[in-house]
Amino acid sequence: MRGARGAWDLLCVLLVLLRGQTATSQPSASPGEPSPPSIHPAQSELIVEAGDTLSLTCIDPDFVRWTFKTYFNEMVENKKNEWIQEKAEATRTGTYTCSNSNGLTSSIYVFVRDPAKLFLVGLPLFGKEDSDALVRCPLTDPQVSNYSLIECDGKSLPTDLTFVPNPKAGITIKNVKRAYHRLCVRCAAQRDGTWLHSDKFTLKVRAAIKAIPVVSVPETSHLLKKGDTFTVVCTIKDVSTSVNSMWLKMNPQPQHIAQVKHNSWHRGDFNYERQETLTISSARVDDSGVFMCYANNTFGSANVTTTLKVVEKGFINISPVKNTTVFVTDGENVDLVVEYEAYPKPEHQQWIYMNRTSANKGKDYVKSDNKSNIRYVNQLRLTRLKGTEGGTYTFLVSNSDASASVTFNVYVNTKPEILTYDRLINGMLQCVAEGFPEPTIDWYFCTGAEQRCTTPVSPVDVQVQNVSVSPFGKLVVQSSIDSSVFRHNGTVECKASNDVGKSSAFFNFAFKGNNKEQIQAHTLFTPLLIGFVVAAGAMGIIVMVLTYKYLQKPMYEVQWKVVEEINGNNYVYIDPTQLPYDHKWEFPRNRLSFGKTLGAGAFGKVVEATAYGLIKSDAAMTVAVKMLKPSAHLTEREALMSELKVLSYLGNHMNIVNLLGACTVGGPTLVITEYCCYGDLLNFLRRKRDSFIFSKQEEQAEAALYKNLLHSTEPSCDSSNEYMDMKPGVSYVVPTKTDKRRSARIDSYIERDVTPAIMEDDELALDLDDLLSFSYQVAKGMAFLASKNCIHRDLAARNILLTHGRITKICDFGLARDIRNDSNYVVKGNARLPVKWMAPESIFSCVYTFESDVWSYGIFLWELFSLGSSPYPGMPVDSKFYKMIKEGFRMVSPEHAPAEMYDVMKTCWDADPLKRPTFKQVVQLIEKQISDSTKHIYSNLANCNPNPENPVVVDHSVRVNSVGSSASSTQPLLVHEDA
């Protein structure tokens, strides 16, 4: 049997040799040149059923060798002429190559068709950004259709993903993008009408390096004492680990420093971070110098330097004070400011008054700031100084190595005050006065009982004596005059004066015989009485004129109105004076330290202040304080109290300026609210016009921490509910380019105990996503007000404030706005009204409703997307303007508004109030325009809002006919005349 088999094989070999000259699948050689071996069967591809015998023969006069390359690139060798595989398996699918001694080869590709195994799957799926990646899923059966790539969960592949199938190798993904990272795919094909799928492949993308590393150090200068430990951490950020870094000392040539500790980690898929920690355990003076942190990748290099200065011992250097001699008028405030450099940091700081007592009295306060690593500022504010409080004020500061001091000489200028003037002693008239600077006493005489004398007394008749001399307090001066110089009945005036002011006293006397006696002036029909009557009459006329003008001028009132009920076409407002006030809001006014004025109007002002112990007993926080001017009348005081009650009634919301406290007893009413560090939105938009970026393209997420923020189910804020300290925030990254910058801002609202931010909000550019976010936030805030039955009546960009994280807050700025000089407010009757922001029913019928607020919101959107332009540009408010509003004139789309947002504006400007959307519906419309990450961030921030309340939401989808008369006290605009 074996002999028969051998003969058969020999016959096959001969047949192959005879046919080899014509077989197109085998390589051929020119006469005289070595020829490649021949393979039987003589074809480029062979299909073998699984379980059958695979038999291949290599024919060549010389030695031959078979090699088989598996689907996962392993090589199997066979040095026989024949390759026989009994019961072939699908894993034997691949390329079989025969080579001879001349190095010439011939190949055949074999498919081992297995009904149970269509795909050969092996090796993980890796790809480099901007290159091709091969999904190794070759087929065991080439006779299938629709060989392609699908997403694991049945979703659509990325729209820009393209691939090329090859049954022998797999499927090649062309031009891999970073966005494909962790994309799960399967190979798929159709056999006999049935879809078959391979195992899962997860694509891991290696980022292409397209930028230099980001290198940073927390401080660019360091000051140490000899023997202290110097530690500086350099942070290097790149897309992958293929970045080199080191510390160098510039001496002046760079010298590599080997004693460096390395730490590294991945903060997300394409965010690799490394820290190089340089430590000098015991610094010497000659260690001073410039240290450079250097990093490079295939794209380029980056570096940052920090300077070290080592001193022998600590020091305190007080900066020269321009003027240590201070003059202040009685009752005024004065700030004593000392700037100094100290290292180590000061351990003791104190103000001393007159070398014996502390200068920090109850009504004064001391403020100390660390301006930089070693620079400090200390300020003593002396409030409402009295004449007796002049003197030396000394600032003492010390640390472990040094001490220093500086002394201020404070002089309080006081108006003269006459102490004694009404006695005639031994024929002498005496006048004693005190004041600073030293008063000058002059004497005047007039006949009769007058209250003003003009005839001076000759100086030779006057004796002047300094009673007391004090270096800082009031100076007392006495002057005497001999009464014998007066020959007639009359009045003597003693007048004391200095640079601050003057005061007078009068001495009336009459002759009786040869003696002079002090007498009382006649009290009936005296010139003085007549003068008083005339003055009183003139004063009465003036008062009447002023009263008339006062009644005609606009009065301060709370813009926000709370609706009590809706009766048919009429809104009935709650009288805010009847709202309750909870004294839990009371805050001690002596714990407020006032700073600069943020805004001022005809009735009052808003002042930046520091509140001590508002949230925690040992914490200071920046707040805004509303207050009236000293000239405020009862109506203004009641209006401010009403505003306080309305704010306390509304409760807390992230997108309104929230009430923090109040001072209503022991002085004028103060309303303490949140401080918004970036001012009003209108001016913010105008500042950002030149840096506006019109883009909505997304980038990949850059930090796992912030992915957790986006996908967490719990709020990512702390639970302390502290009011935000208005200092630079912290920076982090989230999936989109704009969200990345927004998160750097918003994080200061959420995470207050992490790395300081690289950028402040006000340094970042403005883009379309910011405008959409502002639109969304203001709509949310107005929806909250509507849920509390509150109508705003003056919604505009000027009444929206901006704080850290670019969080918008709706406010009523009427108290601190000078509407008399604001062209946005037009005088009608006794009111100044923002006509260009008002709905037609508000202009012509004085109707203020939820729907009129929606109209104003549409105008606000126009302001927003025009980056702070004035609405109806170039159009004055006159009869022509009123006519155009009545006839349905509406503004065209602003330059930067997407079509969808202009559609929202037009729905807000519907002439029929009932057809305008509610704020709840506006929120839903804008939610479709903003990114999911922005919505999620906003949701997290809303959950973090301190002391949240859960108001009962009133559904305003049940609309009423709003065109009715208003209970507002504001007068309606007069119907205009046609142009």
Curated annotation (Swiss-Prot):
Binding-site residues for ATP, renumbered to this chain: 599-606, 626, 674-680, 798
Cytoplasmic compartment spans: 549-979
Effect annotated for changing F860S: Mice display white fur, hearing loss, anemia and mast cell deficiency, plus sterility in both males and females
Catalytic activity: L-tyrosyl-[protein] + ATP = O-phospho-L-tyrosyl-[protein] + ADP + H(+)
Effect of Y571F: Abolishes interaction with PTPN11/SHP-2
Source organism per UniProt: Mus musculus
Signal peptide bounds: 1-24
Protein's recorded name: Mast/stem cell growth factor receptor Kit
Mutagenesis or variant effect for V835M: In W41; decreased kinase activity
Function as written in the Swiss-Prot or TrEMBL entry: Tyrosine-protein kinase that acts as a cell-surface receptor for the cytokine KITLG/SCF and plays an essential role in the regulation of cell survival and proliferation, hematopoiesis, stem cell maintenance, gametogenesis, mast cell development, migration and function, and in melanogenesis. In response to KITLG/SCF binding, KIT can activate several signaling pathways. Phosphorylates PIK3R1, PLCG1, SH2B2/APS and CBL. Activates the AKT1 signaling pathway by phosphorylation of PIK3R1, the regulatory subunit of phosphatidylinositol 3-kinase.
Residues under site feature: Important for interaction with phosphotyrosine-binding proteins: Y938
Ligand binding (Mg(2+)): Y571, N799, D812
UniProt modified residues of type Phosphotyrosine: Y550, Y556, Y571, Y573, Y706, Y723, Y732, Y825, Y902, Y938
Additional information: Numerous proteins are phosphorylated in response to KIT signaling, but it is not evident to determine which are directly phosphorylated by KIT under in vivo conditions.
Stated family: Belongs to the protein kinase superfamily. Tyr protein kinase family. CSF-1/PDGF receptor subfamily.
Modification comment: Ubiquitinated by SOCS6. KIT is rapidly ubiquitinated after autophosphorylation induced by KITLG/SCF binding, leading to internalization and degradation.
Disulfide partners: C58-C98, C137-C187, C152-C184, C234-C293, C431-C494
Active site residues per record: D794 (proton acceptor)
